[in-house]
């Protein structure tokens, strides 16, 4: 079977119905591609590098990304369902307004990434890095956070009620002046001083 690059698959999709299905892409280096509004289903991306690519309003169904690097990429208003990102680097990428449902982010990096007004529905973060990420005004429904680093992350106007952060690093997180985002969140005794500092309580 002939191997097709992502650029070739994208060009073919643009000529037809903006639809990519059952694709397998390995070691592709893609720069400056406009994959906006593309619909990708049941496809695998492995050891691929995407630089300054646009995935605005793109949809990914049952897609797997392994050991991929996304640099300067925009996923604004993109949709992910039953997707898995494993050992991927998405530092500084823009996921504003994106929706993720029934998806897994495993051992992946999202440092400085922006998820402003994004939606996570039954999304699992497992051993991932969200240091200094912008997780503002998000809507979270039954997410699972496992050993995830949120150091310096901004949760402004993102309600965390009912969420379990016991397994995570939350040093230096940012919330609103009222700290309303933290009401009902589950933390450990070791994490309590971090939250106390946010609400102006001094522990002696």
Which residues make up each language-model segment?
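Tandem repeat scaffolds
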Residues: 2-204
